[in-house]
Amino acid sequence: MLKSSKKEDDSKKNHDNKSIFHLRKLFSPIKSLFSNKVPDDFFSVIKRLKTNSQKMTLDERNILANLLKLKGKTIEDIMVPRSDIAAIKLTTNIEELNESIKVKIPHTRTLIYDGTLDNIVGFIHIKDLFKALVTKQNFRLKKLIRKHIIAAPSMKLLDLLAKMRREKTHIAIVIDEYGGTDGLVTIEDVMEALVGRIDDEHDQKSEYDNYKVINNSTIISNARVEVEVLEEIIGEKLKDDDDEFDTISGLVLTKMGNVPAVGTKINVSENIEIEVTDANPRSLKQVKITLKNSLKRAKSS
């Protein structure tokens, strides 16, 4: 039996880890196409690029192959079904929200409904909720709601991606023929279909789901916690407006170019060091954040 070389094995192992970082390079010449519905001739252009380019890496060629496969895929192929949707009632009070954070909010974004799940009014971001729970002044859940978009299950995935970009939102509610809620799809779901598994936002909640301030210089955090949340805690800006990542995981992957091994330490600024404390070959799970200067205000999720 033929055995692959170590170099070939390492290439395969790192393939999925690095692919997301080729997207910006691949799409920069054609990103204007995503401002509207994706035209059919877009795919012929991509096919020619895939066939004729001699300068593309294996990762880039595979992403283009996945892009071509997405041509016929619809929202229905990847959506989270209604039965698996976690949502909160619009009338939920602050005490109930405190409990929901512990047991009912597994993701950074959670849907809000009025009356029944067929009447989704929007979604809240966990960072907005944390701020509101800290202040507790004139708390109204309605003030925290962000807009979502509506889509049919038959909508093509690339058309959905274009619409999400245009509307500047990451969540779409899928409706059935009667106007009821049929499912949910996030931009992460679409990107996973394009580049392979990024990190499953729909996994069971783990012990690392939020973050914990250990002391004035140390934070233990789930790698999926958003960078904006970390910025608020430490009082330091880590993300530029044009950066295309949202989470601590995205920050680390952008710095490293791959998924670093457990124990790897990354200096993301003069004041901040991030150490990988839990990871698998495909994604980061947990990190330890160490600050040379103390936190401006210590708080825990």
UniProtKB/Swiss-Prot annotation:
GO terms (molecular function) for this protein are: flavin adenine dinucleotide binding
Which SMART domains does the record cross-reference, listed alphabetically? Answer: CorC_HlyC (SM01091)
Task: State the GO CC annotations.
Answer: plasma membrane
Q: Which organism is it from?
A: Rickettsia bellii (strain RML369-C)
Q: Which Pfam families match?
A: CBS, CorC_HlyC
Give all residue intervals belonging to the CBS domain.
79-141, 144-201
What more does the record tell us?
It is not know if this bacteria is hemolytic.
Q: Which gene encodes it?
A: tlyC
Which family is annotated?
Belongs to the UPF0053 family. Hemolysin C subfamily.
- Tell me what this protein is called: Possible hemolysin C
Which UniProt keywords are present, listed alphabetically?
A: CBS domain, Repeat
